[in-house]
């Protein structure tokens, strides 16, 4: 039902999240056993993926290869493959331990399982997750005098297995994730050109998160999704328009059960997807301009994506809580050609110099967290 609704609304990729493998019936079991649970998915991916593809959707899958559950076949067979300081109980995070990816035999075992699963069906996307920090970093394969090397060896091991995946599956998009953006860095971006920016999907918090991340990384690398409300992290309720516009400043998607949406919400989602597809080149290849600083607690946050030739732009704005008798507000744009005139949302035209100096007059926002977009195109 979810996939069918997604396809009808214009979604292009359907991702199967945690729980599809081993005896993964809770957070405390199954990690490390990367075989499809055929009780949950009869016929495996070989049966599921063609059905998804038949709806016009590509298929993606979630994995967390660096972790292991103590309640797993892998751990019971090889308890020494997990980081653990001799003579001490290990520190658990999310009821899981960290596999020693500094060891070739560990990487070979895990990757062999993953390769078999991914090869079984036309997988287009892999979300590579990592949901706890490294503790008890002690490798059973190295003497005490070399334990200081383990952190570095571990990272090289992660890179090595990702490189193997890239070589074996060059057409698959790998998205990195680490409890959100905990491992958002240049090294991982080489292997995973898209990284989940944060597990905090609240639209208002994301304005700050994505603003800060943009100082180091292109917006097209930031995984950014619309999620359900009340938001599961903070309980905030924001309009669907605000959530959609906030997510469009990154690698856009939806993290919610679309089959539960109202007809009005589905219409809005369809429009958002059409907008993102129409302006995809601008969002991913245009020049990014920060028009306001969300850390200054102003009345709104705004940004723009401008084409390199400065003839087109998408300006996005999300307002904060509503104000009684608000002052007149104008948004000064950036990146336009001062000598050109721009048609705004297909209607009236204004000069680039006017829009960048006097600004675009904003409407009065009634209600909390209102949002809008301006679509600019040069008239000459």
Residue spans for each PLM region:
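C-terminal beta-strand-rich structural cap/linker in extracellular carbohydrate-active enzymes
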Residues: 352-380
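Carbohydrate-binding surface patches
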Residues: 294-337
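Short acidic/histidine-rich active-site segments
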Residues: 124-135, 175-182
